[in-house]
């Protein structure tokens, strides 16, 4: 009997964890700016939303998908000066035509093939389910480089069961602010500082999703530094 109860507890614990109120030590955590982090649970977030349907935007890498396998392969195949999971490398930054060719080749493969190795984040699945139940319209906006073709949209449609999903908006390293304004977003989810800053610039409520500690994107994140709410247990 004890063994059966223990197994049941171990099975249910991850589910229960997502619905626990924010712990005291989390509410007193300090952002890099010295201010307290505004932690929010999934349940609290849902209760804070307006009753009528809204338009929401998800970032892709490290927010909706754990896509590090593709970027890790790309770095090994093409070199770290060409492939990065962050936003620092642009085609015009590369010195040689060969490096620029490799750059475009990687992004073509990333957007058409390598997401077969990406894994949806559990928190993203929970968020998408919540927004679908509310009747909200969901968009995905990414700073990935667009090279003329992509299967990312179809991957996201299948992964999150969104058959009516509009094509992913690729900004090719440019700011997401115009895209947020164009779709008239009310809420956005992102893991990077750029996601948060550009959401604020567009007048959109930003929610910080924690980046996995095993992500190959090592660009610093200053969670809570912009006054944004940070989603509890969103690393997974």
Per-region residue spans from a language model:
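Substrate-recognition "cap/lid" segment bordering the active-site pocket of phosphatases
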Residues: 145-197
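Bacterial N-terminal signal peptides that target proteins for export
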Residues: 2-10
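Bacterial N-terminal signal peptides
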Residues: 10-19
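Acidic, Mg2+-coordinating phosphoryl-transfer loop and its flanking beta/alpha structural elements
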Residues: 185-236
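Structural recognition of the beta-strand scaffold that forms the well-ordered cores
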Residues: 55-58, 65, 138-142, 167-169, ...
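Short, acidic loop-to-helix structural element flanking the phosphoryl-transfer center
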Residues: 84, 97-100, 104-139, 146-150
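Non-catalytic pre-domain segments flanking phosphatase-related domains
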Residues: 2, 22-60, 225-236
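Active-site neighborhood of HAD-like aspartate-dependent phosphohydrolases
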Residues: 43-116
């Amino acid at each position: 009997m004890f063994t059966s109860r223990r197994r049941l507890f171990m099975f249910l614990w991850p589910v229960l964890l997502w619905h626990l109120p924010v712990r005291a030590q989390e509410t007193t955590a300090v952002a890099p700016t010295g201010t307290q982090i505004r932690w929010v649970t999934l349940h609290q977030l849902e209760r804070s939303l307006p009753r009528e349907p809204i338009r929401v935007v998800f970032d892709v890498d490290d927010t909706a998908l754990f896509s590090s396998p593709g970027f890790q392969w790309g770095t090994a195949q093409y070199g770290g000066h060409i492939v990065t999971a962050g936003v620092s490398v642009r085609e015009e930054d590369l010195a040689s035509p060969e490096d620029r060719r490799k750059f475009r080749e990687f992004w073509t493969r990333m957007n058409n093939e390598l997401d077969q190795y990406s894994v949806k984040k559990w928190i993203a699945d929970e968020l998408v389910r919540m927004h679908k139940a509310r009747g909200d319209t969901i968009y995905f906006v990414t700073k990935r480089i667009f090279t003329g073709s992509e299967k990312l949209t179809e991957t996201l449609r299948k992964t999150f069961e969104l058959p009516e999903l509009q094509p992913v908006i690729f900004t090719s390293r440019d700011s997401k602010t115009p895209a947020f304004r164009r779709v008239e977003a009310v809420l956005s989810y992102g893991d990077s500082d750029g996601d948060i800053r550009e959401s604020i610039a567009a007048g959109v409520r930003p929610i910080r999703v924690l980046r996995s500690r095993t992500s190959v994107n090592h660009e610093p994140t200053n969670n809570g530094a912009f006054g944004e709410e940070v989603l509890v247990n969103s690393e997974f």
